[in-house]
């Protein structure tokens, strides 16, 4: 196995890493509410503090960083292992949102916090297509007695248009596009299932009818055992790599 080297630690629940051309990595710290840059020598600097729960991140067509902000999570530290994990929505939670952050100035601009009459509950992961539009998941929020049903959205980066593409889903998390951008992949956290949806146009997909599919998507993988799926990325050859919780690894699936 390839050895690993720790570049930076003491990050407060980091997610959404973006490899930059200068060798740095931009990521979010959910528990800290920041967008942070990690230099190759381990130095860190805060780019912006949008607050709430900055989650997935991606560089847009204009060079700005676009953030899925889940609105905030409540965290709990395990008294035995010392690890920190989210245990529900934050006490001061109001709504989820999509934000644009200028990397040069740190200015935070809110683009979307609802789609029609439906508010964004907990946006999680985001990817841009070659036309410069974004696809993102809304995992939703979990409370003591209930949880939201999630969705996938498509939106323009200037804040002018947003569409609900797929709903309902069970905790949709990672999202990615096939190399030819004919397919959008969505990973559900709690079910540990990876689905594929055929893209038919800007913000539209074809849906497989019930009972062949309960989500409308084609099931790509559903490995056995107790695990959960997180963010994903698609390799140049089309393989889908899904961060996998509990087993602590990467699940690689053929399309």
Q: Where does each model-flagged region fall?
A:
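Sequence-structural signature of mature extracellular/luminal beta-sheet repeat domains
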Residues: 1-255
């Amino acid at each position: 196995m390839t050895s690993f080297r720790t570049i930076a630690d003491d990050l407060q629940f980091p997610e959404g890493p973006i490899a930059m051309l200068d060798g740095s990595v931009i990521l979010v710290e959910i528990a800290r509410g920041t967008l942070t840059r990690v230099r190759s020598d381990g130095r860190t600097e805060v780019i912006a503090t949008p607050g709430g729960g900055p989650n997935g991140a991606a560089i847009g067509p204009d060079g700005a960083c676009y953030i899925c902000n889940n609105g905030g999570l409540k965290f709990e530290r395990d008294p035995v292992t010392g690890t920190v994990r989210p245990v529900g929505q934050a006490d001061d939670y109001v709504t989820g949102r999509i934000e644009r952050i200028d990397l040069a100035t740190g200015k935070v601009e809110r683009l979307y916090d609802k789609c029609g009459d439906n508010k964004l509950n907990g946006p999680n992961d985001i990817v841009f297509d070659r036309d410069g539009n974004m696809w993102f998941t809304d995992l939703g929020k979990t409370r003591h007695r209930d949880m939201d049903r999630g969705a996938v959205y498509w939106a323009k980066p200037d804040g002018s248009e947003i569409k609900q593409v797929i709903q309902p889903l069970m905790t949709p998390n990672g999202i990615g596009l096939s190399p030819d951008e004919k397919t959008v992949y969505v990973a559900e956290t709690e079910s540990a299932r990876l689905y594929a949806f055929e893209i038919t146009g800007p913000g539209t997909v074809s849906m497989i009818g019930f009972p062949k599919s309960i989500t409308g998507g084609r099931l790509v993988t559903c490995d056995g055992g107790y695990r959960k799926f997180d963010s994903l990325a698609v390799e140049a050859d089309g393989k889908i790599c899904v961060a996998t919780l509990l087993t602590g690894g990467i699940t690689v699936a053929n399309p």
